[in-house]
């Protein structure tokens, strides 16, 4: 690449293989203002509404009830899995995944035909897949209208993944009144999945790339039992290390580090850790017995373990004890006063869940005088600590105008955060597992599905796979494997969506796409706009590119002063940019002092000449952006030559023997020489 591609397309400022600029992912941060907190609506509008009932009695729901048409039965089949309700759908889905893995275009054709037949017969889950197929242009001509129509039918039939896709579509169009309704339903399902079921709300989205390079550090930690660090930890645990036992128990309980959740193994390691005197395991044992995770549910044992943990100074255990008292589980009877006291103890020790549960008491008026504003403050503290249920309650408040000023945009954003933790988020884990096994095609399909549902990490992962692996990505187009045009267009669309959700590196890639005309018409003005957006997020490479465009008058006014300013800002933002910035400043010096000369015209022509001689240096220069590097390198050599020649002229003038024949040094030349230390 010429501008941006000095680095590897996403994060680095220069793409030559040995230089990378700093990489920083920018998370989306949602902030509540004082106006929101102080100007709330009707504080008395909640009453005893079940909408805000955290402590109500609810029946556990199965995976199929929470996520109809779930893909789990394909990736994690068990004896309880039932596919009889949609045999044609599951058959077609299996074939789609197999075709993506094998790169088998004929099988993919057969699979989509089978799915289409099921869709025409009214299967909502097959209709959801057809919405996906039309959305990306796989085996069918890309059609936003047909995709939208199929997702509507699927959502009406109860498919949650299509509801996610529709909600994100409405969100992108700022149709918050429609988006908020769907996200509210999805968030409620997500909350049910980790409040009622035995699964915990822990999500580990993994960005498989760091810039244009593979994120080797994160991927290494996601290899599960094959990870060398895990094997060392397991060895230490087997030798009696209590801390190692506790950590392994955590990994299995929450399904961390690429491990599948295994509550039985978690229970085994927590019990061994407790035997060795490890107190943190006591609290988790209390939670395990309260949830019935891997054991028969036993609230009496849960209370015993939580009480022991609290005595050991694990103050978050107070929150669990308070919950048992408010529900009347494992104790003589419900006792709201004791529940409040335990929640307050947890709050005094800054436990997020304690803040959340105390907020629920004030919201409902359970054991305390009802105070919605006080509840809001507790929810706010819990949300700042990342408590997903607190985001859910705040979303409801913004949605209904209870306790907070009604704000559908904020409600939608908060609901979305919670909805993305629903059972359908398992697609991310299966995609990562496929990628780690080298099954890039299956990973691409899974990430693309999640991208459609609005997951920013999945959008950038899918786009990166398309860019990084090219033909090896197993990308399927309308009538075969994706052409370069189809692949670039798909990647461009994905980067664009990720950019809209705050991914600064995606904005950088959008600028690249417009600058080089990849996946879209070449447009320097829109490229500059995208780079400006990335620059506003302190992206060094975007600053460099803006300097380059000012220097050459591409999409921005020709302005050498602004060019230098952006080059300098790039270096200030990232010290790794020193070499490219030095080369760029060398080019700028030539342009200032030798404008409209043959020398500058030759330098400017190098990017066009470069492809003709590329075969001569293909073992040295691999990226199109290196044409710019070659150009700047020539500039540097030229400047060094000119400076040396000028230095010799100065020496001649200073020589007393030659003084009588020496000509006075041009003032401009002297000024420029003074600017360069010798």
Curated annotation (Swiss-Prot):
Family note: Belongs to the sel-1 family.
Glycosylation sites: 298, 335
Gene Ontology BP terms: ERAD pathway; hyperosmotic salinity response
Designated name of the protein: ERAD-associated E3 ubiquitin-protein ligase component HRD3A
Sel1-like repeats: 124-159, 242-277, 279-313, 317-349, 353-386, 388-422, 506-537, 540-568
Keywords: Endoplasmic reticulum, Glycoprotein, Membrane, Repeat, Signal, Transmembrane, Transmembrane helix
Record carries keyword Transmembrane: yes
Cleavable signal peptide: 1-25
Regions annotated as coiled coil: none
Gene Ontology cellular component terms for the protein in this record: endoplasmic reticulum; endoplasmic reticulum membrane
Lipid bilayer topology: Single-pass membrane protein
Residue intervals passing through the bilayer: 620-640
Function comment: Component of the endoplasmic reticulum (ER) quality control system called ER-associated degradation (ERAD) and involved in ubiquitin-dependent degradation of misfolded endoplasmic reticulum proteins. Functions as an ERAD substrate-recruiting factor that recognizes misfolded proteins for the HRD1 E3 ubiquitin ligase complex. Targets the misfolded LRR receptor kinase BRI1.
One Pfam entry name: Sel1
Top-rank taxon: Eukaryota
Natural source organism: Arabidopsis thaliana
